[in-house]
Swiss-Prot record:
It is an enzyme of class 2 (transferase). Its EC number is 2.1.3.15. It comes from the Bacteria. Belongs to the AccA family. The lineage of its organism: Bacteria, Pseudomonadati, Campylobacterota, Epsilonproteobacteria, Campylobacterales. Pfam families: ACCA. Residues 36-286 form the CoA carboxyltransferase C-terminal domain. PROSITE patterns: COA_CT_CTER. One of its GO terms (biological process) is fatty acid biosynthetic process. Keywords: ATP-binding, Cytoplasm, Fatty acid biosynthesis, Fatty acid metabolism, Lipid biosynthesis, Lipid metabolism, Nucleotide-binding, Transferase. It comes from Campylobacter jejuni subsp. jejuni serotype O:6 (strain 81116 / NCTC 11828). This is Acetyl-coenzyme A carboxylase carboxyl transferase subunit alpha. Pathway: Lipid metabolism; malonyl-CoA biosynthesis; malonyl-CoA from acetyl-CoA: step 1/1. Gene3D superfamilies: 2-enoyl-CoA Hydratase, Chain A, domain 1. GO terms for molecular function: acetyl-CoA carboxylase activity; ATP binding; carboxyl- or carbamoyltransferase activity.
Amino acid sequence: MASYLDFEKNIQQIDEDIINAQIKGDTEAVSILKKNLEKEISKTYKNLSDFQRLQLARHPDRPYALDYIELILNDAHEIHGDRAFRDDPAIVCFMGYLGEKKIIVIGEQKGRGTKDKIARNFGMPHPEGYRKALRVARLAEKFQIPILFLIDTPGAYPGIGAEERGQSEAIARNLYELSDLKIPTIAIVIGEGGSGGALAIGVADRLAMMKNSVFSVISPEGCAAILWNDPAKSEAATKAMKVTADDLKSQGLIDDVIDEPTNGAHRNKEAAAVAIADYVKKSLNELENIDVRELSANRMQKILKLGAYQEA
């Protein structure tokens, strides 16, 4: 059963009317309603607010890393474990083919359904998850296979056990190691890009965001609680923080924005997957013509420019 956000109520009503008309066998009404649905979707999604895009980034029906892996990879095989503590299901790693190109995909997976969400810790990786990602990244470098990172997490897990096992060290180690990989790397924020939990697999030659994704150092709710002592002001915080793909592109913090289907990735996963696959293929064609040492140097220069400013 589809899930609807508060600003999608008109869409929900038309969807329900279509189902009722189909049950009655009223083909003429179905045809008219589908045209009305297209108009309503176009109207609803034409001028989304920052807060509405945040809601879409968290939409329960939004495609996750495993959905995209299933849709874009052929002959995919999962790689498990960090070879030090355990296999963290919040991070998934696959080797497969994107068209004719061999590629490794490393993604953060939130999980669907109560049991899966709990098993995957709601997409909040432990340090062993980031160490698994790094182990697989080193394998990719060893065999000269490009990497696609799919970012989608509310943040790295802040529990006591995670901190005892070195959460901050694991994130810092990934930032250090991934910045110097001698292979082409691409990172895409497909939903939520939550702080260090996102950055830990976000150091790449190309950093892109899906149109309805967000990337921030703290959740808008957390920001509102700290600045105004009122989590209910999260909508104002979302706007002030400039967390959307267009905001971050305008500030030079990401390289590209990947357009989603008009009705959002959650209503057309296949089209969203095609958009990602096309972007990755195009980017790899560009990156594979650059010497790997130059890639590493360019990556480092891009990192050093982050946060730079000029006084007026």
